[in-house]
């Protein structure tokens, strides 16, 4: 390969389409805007959601629900994920963060019962589902709510 043989990547050097520059270009005269009307004008076009005067969809549908400003977002950990730790390990939210099981703590860690745990672990978390608590204790481990 030599310097004079280098070519830009396919499609990376697209030529700008200059509209309104003669009929031979295929985009002359009306520049692809058609004849007259709101969309042909400078600054023309309708606002987002406008349906030509018909009551727009977002106004036809009823309002529903609300956003709870006190909502707590827990980092979810399933039992199947806990099997990666050695027998007898104390599993804490900090350890879960370090090992990359969870990306951030949010409002705490909640352990759910998806999968099965085969190791004896001491699990410390902010919340447990009742079935997850039973499964950990059945495997000989212990549960501690922080």
Curated annotation (Swiss-Prot):
Segments of skewed composition (Basic and acidic residues): 1-13
Family matches, as SUPFAM superfamilies: Ribosomal proteins L15p and L18e
Coiled-coil annotated residue ranges, if any: none
Top-level taxon of origin: Bacteria
Gene Ontology BP terms: translation
Assembly with partners or alone: Part of the 50S ribosomal subunit.
PANTHER family named in the record: 50S RIBOSOMAL PROTEIN L15, LARGE RIBOSOMAL SUBUNIT PROTEIN UL15M
The protein's name: Large ribosomal subunit protein uL15
Organism: Bacillus cereus (strain ATCC 14579 / DSM 31 / CCUG 7414 / JCM 2152 / NBRC 15305 / NCIMB 9373 / NCTC 2599 / NRRL B-3711)
């Amino acid at each position: 390969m030599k310097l004079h043989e280098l070519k830009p990547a396919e499609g990376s050097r697209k030529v700008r389409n200059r509209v309104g520059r003669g009929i031979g270009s295929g985009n002359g005269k009306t520049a692809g805007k058609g004849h007259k009307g709101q969309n042909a004008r400078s600054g023309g076009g309708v606002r987002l959601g406008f349906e030509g005067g018909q009551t727009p969809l977002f106004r036809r549908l009823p309002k529903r629900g609300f956003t709870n400003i006190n909502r707590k977002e827990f980092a979810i950990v399933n039992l199947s994920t806990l099997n990666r730790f050695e027998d007898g390990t104390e599993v804490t939210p900090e350890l879960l963060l370090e090992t990359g099981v969870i990306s951030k703590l949010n409002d705490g860690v909640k352990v759910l019962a998806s999968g099965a745990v085969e190791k004896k672990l001491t699990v410390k978390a902010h919340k447990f589902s009742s079935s997850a608590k039973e499964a950990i204790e059945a495997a000989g481990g212990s549960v501690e709510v922080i």
